[in-house]
Amino acid sequence: PYLMLPARFVRNIGASVTGTTAAGLAGHSVGVVKGTVHEAMLAAFFPAIKAQPFDNKEALLTALKERKIDAAFADALQLSFWVASSASDKCCALFDGPYMSEHFLGEGMTIMLRQNDSVLTAAIDHALATLSRNGRLQEIYLRYFPYGLY
């Protein structure tokens, strides 16, 4: 995969969270969309954090913005866009992480090519590796995801 899609915490900047790691969220209200891989991952990775379930992402982010919860745990890509958007009213910031898990989040994003096109596959693999090594891939990520994924 050329892009892993991690989970992240986002916190309301008005919440008094101690420290800069997820351990500081113990005892705080942390929202998550119920029935999702993020709910299962939160329970598995952070058993000391009691999750507050929400029916959907919109309800979760509204509660976070209105400070009904101190933090949320969800898809890093979606959270990055939300934090950078006017919808967040600059209430919140990404916090700790990223958290990767092939078990919960899958293998990441890949580029699909014809199975028998080994020349094109090798060329794309080489180009992505070169971009990664010289820092250009990170530069491109930050252009489109200014708050980062990782």
What does each model-identified segment do?
Residues P1-Y150:
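Proline/Glycine/Serine-rich low-complexity intrinsically disordered segments
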